[in-house]
């Protein structure tokens, strides 16, 4: 099976849609995607992903399934609530509700637990942002999606009784 992970076009975050450039990118993508034998289309519920896929759906006469777990990963934290996290974002003006992946590289390098398979789950950043629960929600959603196409998780691997050559497209973030 082939998974196509497609990021939305150039975003206009203020209106949760696309810029003029993003609309053009989505149109060009649709020109290519109409020739790809996609078995199923899936899309994030957010406007910029939906605006991106709309061109492909119109071009192909197809529909997409909206999957809530494919929204942009919403883990945020307030670094002001922790002495250890105050310097994670530098001197940026916005000091509350920061997304976890915007931390400075220096912070990541000084906290190697963030880069380990299980260590990140108990890190201060993860616990303050609710990241483990959000991650588990996404992992569960992906497992369910893959199972619906015949691939079931067994530990760290996916197992299938009968493989397939299906292509599925996920329009997300």
Stretch-by-stretch model annotation:
Residues 31-118:
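Phosphate-coordination/substrate-recognition cap region in phosphate-metabolizing enzymes
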Residues 121-137:
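Surface-exposed cleft-lining segments at the edges of enzyme active sites
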Residues 15, 19, 135:
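Flexible, glycine- and charge-enriched loops at secondary-structure boundaries
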Residues 8-12:
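Short polar catalytic/cofactor-binding loops
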Residues 132, 136, 140-173:
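Active-site-adjacent alpha-helix immediately C-terminal to a catalytic or transition-state-stabilizing loop
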Residues 1-4:
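Extreme N-terminal starter segment of soluble prokaryotic enzymes
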Residues 18-33:
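Short catalytic helix/loop segments, enriched in acidic residues and glycine
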Residues 25, 29, 49-52, 134, ...:
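Alpha-helical packing segments of well-folded alpha/beta enzyme cores
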């Amino acid at each position: 099976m082939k998974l196509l992970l497609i990021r939305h076009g150039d975003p206009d975050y203020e209106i949760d849609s696309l810029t003029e450039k993003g609309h053009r990118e989505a149109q060009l993508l649709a020109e290519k995607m109409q020739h790809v034998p996609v078995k199923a289309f899936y899309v994030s519920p957010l406007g910029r992903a939906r605006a991106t896929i709309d061109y492909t759906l119109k071009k192909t006469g197809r529909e997409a399934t909206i999957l809530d777990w494919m929204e942009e990963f919403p883990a945020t934290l307030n670094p002001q609530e922790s002495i250890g996290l105050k310097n994670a974002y530098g001197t940026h003006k916005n000091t509350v509700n920061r997304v976890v992946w915007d931390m400075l590289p220096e912070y990541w390098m000084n906290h190697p637990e963030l880069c380990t398979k299980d260590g990140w789950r108990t890190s201060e950043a993860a616990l303050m942002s609710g990241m483990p629960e959000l991650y588990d929600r996404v992992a569960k959603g992906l497992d369910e999606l893959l199972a619906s196409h015949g691939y079931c998780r067994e530990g760290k691997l996916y197992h299938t009784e009968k493989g397939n050559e299906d292509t599925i497209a996920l329009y997300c973030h």
